[in-house]
Amino acid sequence: MIIQKYLHNLKAWNALPVERQETIIGRKKPSDIEQRPFDKASYAHNVLTNIEEGGQQLHILRDNMPFGEVGKGEFGTYFIGYARSPDRIEKMLNNMFIGNPPGNYDRILDFSTAVTGGLFFVPGVVSGRCGSAGREGVNFRKL
């Protein structure tokens, strides 16, 4: 499991045209619909964070929680990600910060700065599934 705190330069981000923001993220802003694969920039956030091996996507369960302290003018997100292997998370971070290929980094990092974080071992569940009664839940065997 990885946890990271990112601070965002919202003034600089909001100064960008919407089309540029969409190119950086790889999604349409008003609808949040993912752009078609051939329309995405190679440095789009959702391209570089998609990890594949042998043509198969390697799953990472991800979530972001926005936060803000108006008095400090500090705004950002806490990111948390779970994966079967830390190799998946390391590959995602390498793609984002170094680039794939090197130099083709995630342009969202021009506006977001990781200020803290950690990588933790979390033991698996016995059944391989986690969820409430009556619902399938998340299949952690894929992660």
Model-derived regions: residue spans:
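Long, histidine/aromatic-enriched segments associated with O2/redox biology
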Residues: 1-143
